Regions:
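A short acidic-Thr-Gly-centered motif at the start of a beta-strand
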Residues: 31-38
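Short, surface-exposed ligand- or partner-binding patches at beta-edge/loop junctions that are enriched
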Residues: 84
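Structural scaffold elements adjacent to functional motifs in cytosolic proteins
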Residues: 42-44
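Rhodanese-like catalytic fold shared by cysteine-dependent sulfurtransferases
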Residues: 1-31, 48, 52-77, 92-151
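Sequence-level motif detector for i,i+2 pairs with an aromatic at +2
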Residues: 38-40, 57
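Residue-level preference for short coil/turn positions at secondary-structure junctions
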Residues: 38, 77-78
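Hydrophobic anchor at the start of a short beta-strand
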Residues: 40, 81, 105-106
């Protein structure tokens, strides 16, 4: 069992912020709950320029504004989907659309910021990177590990 302190090292303020963004009935996965990322179809719901800075291993870019044009036939309904964005708000919105279409979906708790802060690997293409596009400078205050990119 992971002690509470180790499982959720993010600041109280960050956890409070996330609690205002997430719907209570939409399932989230904490990074430490993911034994094997390849067990999921990982979808990056950020904008293309954010994805190009860094992403989770083998993540498929679907975008947020662009998501309505994504071909859902590319996904396997028998394999769970993990969606993420910067903090989890955009990904929850995309995730809800996937649920409506019959997919089992989880939102990555805290988004790529929490993932990076927990020191899980990030990639630019196939190579590891420590850069994280934080969407805006305002969201960047929550990134404690890695190199912040805003543009």
């Amino acid at each position: 069992m992971i002690p509470f302190k180790e499982a959720l090292p993010q600041s109280f303020a960050y956890k409070t912020l996330l609690s205002t963004l997430y719907e209570k009935d939409f399932p989230v996965l904490y990074p430490e709950e993911i034994d094997d990322l390849s067990s999921y179809q990982v979808l990056d719901t950020r904008e293309k320029e954010e994805y190009q800075v860094s992403h989770l291993k083998d993540a498929i870019w679907v975008g947020y504004d662009q998501f309505p044009t994504f071909n859902l036939d590319r996904l396997d309904k028998s394999k769970p989907v993990l969606v993420y964005c910067t903090v989890g708000a955009r990904s929850q919105s995309v995730g809800k659309k996937l649920v409506e279409n019959g997919y089992e979906v989880y939102n990555l708790y805290g988004g790529i910021i929490h993932w990076a802060n927990e020191e899980y690997p990030l990639y630019k293409g196939e190579k590891r990177t420590d850069k994280v596009h934080t969407y805006t400078r305002a969201w960047g205050i929550w990134l404690n590990k890695g190199v912040k990119v805003y543009e």
